[in-house]
């Protein structure tokens, strides 16, 4: 079994140091923040090559939700998710985690 981790607040901020830290803790992969990946793609590629630690998936890193009732926000989220998936493909990642919308639908749903 292989075990990966998401980014955590106590991890180093430098991308290379982050990868080295995760590898030193014994993890087999890294579930990266989508925005971090897209905005630092070349640096992430270099860290993967240097450490051998793969980016397996991405979680978060987009501003809209795919189920948002406001069309503009939904489309914005989809565009950002598309960029994240393209970047993931470049580093060999397998997919993106799209968690629940933290109550965004509660104003539309009955109690």
For every predicted segment, state its role.
Residues 3-18:
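Short, Lys/Arg-rich amphipathic segments at extreme N-termini
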Residues 10-14, 31-43, 65-68, 104-108:
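Acidic-and-aromatic substrate-binding clefts and catalytic sites of carbohydrate-active enzymes
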Residues 19-24, 38-59, 82-93:
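Acidic (Asp/Glu)-rich catalytic clusters
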Residues 71-111:
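Active-site acidic/histidine proton-transfer and metal-coordination neighborhood
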Residues 2-7, 30-32, 55-60, 96-98:
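Hydrophobic faces of well-ordered beta-strands that scaffold small-molecule active sites
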Residues 1-4, 34-41, 80-81:
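Short, mixed-charge, low-aromatic patches
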Residues 1-3, 21-28:
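A short, Lys/Arg-enriched amphipathic alpha-helix followed by its capping loop at the start of a domain
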Residues 26, 61-62, 100-102:
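Short, histidine-centered active-site or binding-site loop motifs used for metal coordination
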């Amino acid at each position: 079994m292989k075990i990966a981790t998401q980014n955590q607040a106590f991890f180093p901020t430098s991308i290379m140091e982050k990868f080295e830290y995760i590898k030193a803790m014994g993890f087999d992969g890294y579930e990266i923040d989508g925005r971090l990946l897209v905005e630092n793609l070349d640096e992430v590629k270099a860290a993967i090559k240097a450490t051998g630690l793969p980016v397996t998936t991405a979680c978060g890193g987009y501003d809209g939700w795919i189920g948002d009732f406001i069309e503009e926000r939904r489309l914005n989220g989809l565009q950002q998710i598309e960029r994240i998936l393209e970047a993931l493909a470049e580093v060999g990642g397998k997919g993106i985690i799209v968690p629940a919308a933290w109550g965004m639908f509660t104003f539309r749903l009955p109690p």
